[in-house]
């Protein structure tokens, strides 16, 4: 991840930043999802394939390079995957039922707490994807009530930020969240500012998972994007909801 000059009078030099939230948080979610989905696939519990895709070049000047390349491959029927063993898998006949984009999911807004956005693109299929995310959020929130009654969590408080990744965080209560479904035409949706817009423009049903985004906060596109601004209880909750959403989408009948 990179941030630009640290003040408005700078020369615009690109400075290396840790990118703890943007976008290691979502990358961590993909890695957590992989063994769960692989096990379900081996057991024959998935009705459709799930691709875990790490998209490169979202920021300017690349301008969603990875998302554009993927969409081009899908539209032109040239989708092929190159394996580590040199084998090529032809996926040109695949039809994508939907895409979930995760971008910045681990910073709990200090002014509007415990909210994340479920931002669908255009079309009824995208709204169905958002409905699955809404149901997954309700399932998670119901689970937190039960999990927090256990002796190991009963007397604990909210999670607290840690200054860096070298510290083991304290165990905290599971955090219930409010997932706001924000249509692409609404002012609260930030789909337009992500890879999700590329998929929507190409006619692919898409939903963005993102924190309650604040463009003016410290730690966004600057060198302060470190563990010091990460809320692990919040990020873990959004990640769990996202994984549950994908599982639901891969197992429920399509509309």
Per-region residue spans from a language model:
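Short, glycine/serine-rich, charged loops/turns that create anion-binding
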Residues: 2, 57-59, 213
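Mixed-charge, polar/low-complexity N-terminal
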Residues: 10, 80-81, 86-87, 179-187
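Short glycine/proline-rich turn/loop motifs
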Residues: 10-13, 222-223
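Acidic/histidine-rich catalytic neighborhood of metal-dependent amide-processing enzymes
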Residues: 14-138
């Amino acid at each position: 991840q990179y941030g630009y000059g640290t003040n408005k009078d700078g020369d615009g030099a690109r400075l290396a930043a840790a990118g703890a939230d943007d976008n290691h948080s979502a990358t961590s979610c993909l890695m957590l999802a992989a063994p769960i989905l692989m096990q379900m696939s081996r057991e024959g519990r998935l009705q459709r394939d799930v691709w875990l895709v790490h998209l490169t070049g979202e920021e300017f000047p690349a301008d969603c390079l990875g998302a554009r390349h993927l969409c081009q491959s899908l539209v032109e029927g040239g989708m092929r995957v190159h394996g580590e063993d040199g084998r090529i898998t032809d996926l040109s006949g695949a039809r994508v039922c939907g895409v979930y984009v995760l971008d910045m999911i681990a910073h709990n807004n200090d002014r509007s707490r415990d909210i994340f956005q479920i931002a669908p693109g255009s079309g009824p299929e995208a709204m169905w994807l958002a409905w699955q995310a809404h149901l997954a959020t309700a399932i998670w929130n119901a689970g937190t009530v039960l999990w927090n009654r256990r002796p190991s969590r009963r007397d604990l408080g909210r999670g607290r930020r840690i200054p860096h990744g070298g510290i083991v965080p304290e165990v905290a209560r599971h955090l219930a969240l409010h997932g706001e479904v924000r249509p692409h035409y609404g002012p609260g949706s930030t789909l337009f500012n992500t890879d999700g817009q590329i998929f929507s423009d190409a006619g692919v049903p898409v939903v963005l998972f993102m924190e309650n985004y604040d463009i003016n906060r410290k730690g966004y596109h600057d060198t302060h994007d470190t563990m010091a601004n990460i809320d692990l209880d919040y990020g873990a909750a959004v990640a769990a909801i996202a994984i549950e959403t994908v599982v639901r989408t891969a197992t429920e009948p399509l509309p």
